[in-house]
Amino acid sequence: MKCKLTPQLSSDDWKDFCSRFHFSPADLPYIKAIYTALLPLVESCAYYSLDQNLDGISLPHYAYGFVTLGNGIDELSELYLDHEQIQEAYIVDCVSLLLLSKAYAEFAHVIEDQSGLSLAELSFLGDTYSLDLLPQIYERLAPDAIGLTEGQMLLPLKTAALILHLDTNTHADLRQLCNTCSTFLSFQKISSPGLAAYLWCHADIPYNIAF
């Protein structure tokens, strides 16, 4: 199955953007201008399945899928880098991370609505579940807008594979249910999808980011 996602930043998302990503407050109008320019390039969607048919996962209820922002953001970032506009490329990365975190939340709500179950935990491959599941998930979902390289890299770059543990009981707010947070601080560098998960859960915490 496939669903369109429409992640956007709200006024609250801008309140601590500069402190979180170490920009001067004077840069915010320029950052917002880049956001306005990139938003039409976002073609976010999710490919997913509610079938419990993955080898190696024994949960009674789960869903799995890919969430992507599409190729446009990658192309804009590459364009800036080609012109040695490093700050602009960094701004695109920062904004796209927040957009990806919004897409995760939107996707989780889609799964809850369609399954009639509640999200108990959101996991990313490489954390609770092995990256060895990636080819199997890719084969089952056959996402036409997402590629998988021989090195098991997903393209576009702002794409993640997720396992959503579902339950009949209602759980806490979605932001408390991402298991990436338990391992995030063990790494000096982390992929954009994983970082977006951490941003999603800890929107109030400023920190340094290493790409």
Give names to the regions the model predicted:
Residues 1-84, 88, 159, 205-211:
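Active-site helix-to-loop segments that bind/position phosphate- or nucleotide-bearing substrates
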Residues 30, 34-38, 103, 107, ...:
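General structural feature for long, well-ordered alpha-helical segments within catalytic domains
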Residues 38-49, 98, 102, 106, ...:
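Short secondary-structure junctions and interdomain/linker hinges
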Residues 52, 79-81, 184, 192-195:
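General "foldedness" signal
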Residues 118-190, 196-211:
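Short terminal or interdomain "cap/linker" segment that borders an active site or interface and mediates
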